[in-house]
Regions:
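A conserved, positively charged/aromatic
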Residues: 92-104
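Short, charged, surface-exposed secondary-structure boundary motifs
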Residues: 38-40, 88-95, 113-117, 133-138
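Active-site proximal beta-strand in glycosyltransferases
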Residues: 72-87, 102-105, 124-127, 169
């Protein structure tokens, strides 16, 4: 099959593209920064032109882009997306109901939600990894024989895999730069106290999300005085969903990750790989 992949800065693409190719499929890649996930006339025209030049079986993306869905519907081409974020705000758009879409969601709750809305082609598919790549990475007789190349300021240096080994490692974002910290300065004392309590409660609950249900109509009315909801005309997301996800959700994740790392580091050596203040994701730091 001929597959056109729209690629953004998601780590999943390396394994996915390699897997497509290992199955004998032809993969072409398009990369272009979007003005909006929902509407971008320049990108839509560019994508339309590419799809006219070659007979593609489907377009693939990690996560969902309504603008791509719209073009695929016009061209009569299948659009396949596999989510890696939850909730995926870009899916709360009228284009999810187009026939061209084929959704694979890693979060079963979101899968059930959109299936219940009447989305036609949708399946639950957990996240995956290219096991062949990892098996090859660790196939050497000893870790010392394996070398990883790291580019730093244009100079390539070699590191043994042993340099990156550790009993406990965290790879990811600490979200120490989040919109809540800026908004908090403008919130009245009541809202600050309310949100602090909601986030603390969420941190003590495993397997459930209480943040959005705690955003009552009264609370959201107060929030609207300080937080502007920006969305396209065809989006059906609302203030509660967006604020719970992009503001309180990221702040809660930041608190949870930092507290867990500090608690672990108090008793054990912990390796942290992140793109936040202490350095780039390729850097290794002791917590």
């Amino acid at each position: 099959m001929n597959i056109l992949v729209y690629r953004w800065n998601s780590y999943n693409y390396i394994d996915i593209i390699a897997t497509f190719q290992s199955m004998g499929h032809q993969v072409d890649v398009i990369e272009q920064e979007l003005e909006s996930y929902d509407e971008d006339e320049s990108f839509a025209a560019h994508l339309h032109g590419i799809l006219q030049q070659k007979n593609y079986d489907f377009v693939f993306t990690v996560n969902y882009f309504a603008v791509i869905s719209g073009v695929c519907q016009q061209m009569g081409i299948k659009y396949v997306s596999w989510s890696c974020d939850s909730p995926l705000l870009s899916m709360y758009h009228k284009n999810v109901f187009l026939d061209c879409n084929y959704f694979f969601l890693f979060d079963k709750t979101n899968y059930l939600e959109f299936k219940g809305m009447g989305v036609k082609h949708i399946w639950h598919l957990p996240l995956a990894v290219d096991t062949d790549r990892l098996d090859e990475l660790f196939a050497q007789d000893t870790m010392d024989k394996m070398q990883l190349a790291e580019v730093d300021s244009g100079n390539a240096s070699k590191h043994s895999v042993r340099d990156f080994a550790g009993g406990i490692s965290f790879v990811g974002n600490l979200y120490e730069k989040n919109s809540y910290d800026e908004l908090e300065k403008r919130f009245p004392e009541y809202l600050r106290g309310y949100f602090d309590a909601v986030m603390e409660a969420q941190l003590n609950i495993s397997g459930g999300n209480i943040i959005e249900p705690m955003l009552t109509a009264d609370i959201l009315e107060r929030v609207s005085e300080y937080f502007e909801l920006k969305k396209s005309k065809d989006s059906f997301s609302d203030l509660g969903l967006v604020f719970a996800t992009t503001v309180l959700g990221f702040k809660t994740a930041s608190l949870q990750r930092q507290r867990a790392l500090l608690a672990l580091a108090a008793k054990f050596p912990v390796n942290l790989y992140t793109n936040t203040e202490i350095g780039r994701a390729s850097c290794r730091e002791r917590v």
